[in-house]
Amino acid sequence: MTSLNRRQLAAGLGGAFVLAGCESLGGVAAPAGPAPRLFYLGQAKVLTLDAAGGSPVTLVDDSPKDGSRPTGVNDGIAVHAATGQIYWTNMGRADKDDGYIMRCERDGANVTTIVTPGGTFTPKQLKIDETAAKLYWSDREGMAVQRCNLDGSNIETLVVTGNPVQDAGDQSRWCVGLALDPGRGHVYFTQKGGDNAGQGLIRRIDMQAPRGATSTNRRDMVTLFSRLPEPIDLDLDLASRTLYWTDRGDNTVSRAPMDAPAGFDPATRLDRQILVRGLKEAIGVALDLPRNRMAYTSLGGEVGVAALDGSGARMLVDSGGMLTGVCWA
């Protein structure tokens, strides 16, 4: 891996680029000014990449010094737009309630644990509500969607989809992906189901539960899609009201309207549009809306980019080890 001057990286220098060969992806001209970098996760690493070219830069490396495999795996990543701080989840061991959430500066300095091991079971995709100063994430084996303050305090459980003890191993209850629509007060999340089992769900709840509702009784919950192969991560285009997601079952990136038609059946919706195919265990997805592009990652070590309609797809990294969450910042 190459390195950058920390001051340059913190200031966003080295990120002032336009995606090479894709200045007008989908026919939309790229806006002037510095373009965002990609930030993404390896098993025990936080990395960044200039999507116009160059090599990945490792910001944080928690790999065991003896070369052994990490006991926990990083999964969800988000960057606070105002502070530049990077937040990410680590799943810990799947059979133990030992997941945690970390934070560092944009250049990788000042690594801090803000949710200590066991504060969440197996935290997955992570998002920031900057207006409310809250972190939101899905908890896989914890079978829940949770949130906390930006310093890790005041952890709340918004919805519970199963009992981690009684339902252990029931992957249909595993919460994985997560996205936010703060303007309308909605949280979107996936339940992946078994491996390519056609049990996958995409659901929506309110950020604020209705009066009288509990985490185990969310009468406001809406199932938007069911019987998906194995949906993983989410992102939203709020302007066009479009939902994007990766699916590890058919190894795709897809999109569909956020607002389902009246009287719809989540099991038979026909408005899913597959945009990218052939990924190696698809995981992360992130939209760069001003530049009409998206990025995606896979457990097979891929970091790819494409226009929002899937055109112009190409790989930036094709052998990066096990890769998970991704975001632009």
PLM regions and their residue ranges:
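Short loop/turn segments immediately following beta-strands, especially the blade-tip
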Residues: I205-T214, P257-D265
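An edge-strand/N-cap motif at the start of beta-rich repeat modules
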Residues: A30-V57
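Short loop/turn segments immediately following the C-termini of beta-strands
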Residues: L41-Q43, M91-G92, R140, K192-G194, ...
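A short beta-strand motif characteristic of beta-propeller blades
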Residues: S55-S68, N110-T116, I155-A168, R219-F225, ...
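Structural motif
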Residues: K45-T48, K96-M102, M143-Q146, N196-R203, ...
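N-terminal export signals
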Residues: T2, Q8-S24
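Residue position within the beta-strands of beta-propeller blades
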Residues: Y40, W88-T89, W137, F189, ...
